[in-house]
Amino acid sequence: MAQGKGFGFGLGKIKELQEAFQKAQQVQEGAKVLQEELERMEIPGKSADGLVTVLMSGNQEPLSIEIDPSALEKGAEGLSASVTEAMKAAYAESTETMRSKMEELTSGLNLPGM
């Protein structure tokens, strides 16, 4: 190997590598905190008629379903439609919340592809 020639890892590259590791560690620590935060969230979703409310965690885990007694008058098909609407609404809100929180976590880190 010629004098002064290395493996292409000059001081600048080592500094970049250290910064990349630090960013990865920040994201890992932040992701753990975020995961715990999302687990504690209770995100509601309602049916269009307002008779069914679904609570879902920030991790899209269904937590509970509240059904107004008058929803039973809609019959099985109508009730099923209301529950499905409420589930979809809660899921959409939960995934949007998760996406938004992930953006907050990674903003300013200049991560490729994020």
UniProtKB/Swiss-Prot annotation:
GO terms for molecular function: DNA binding. Its main location: cytoplasm. NCBIfam families: DNA_YbaB_EbfC (TIGR00103). Homodimer. Pfam families: YbaB_DNA_bd. Coiled coil: none annotated. This is Nucleoid-associated protein slr1847.
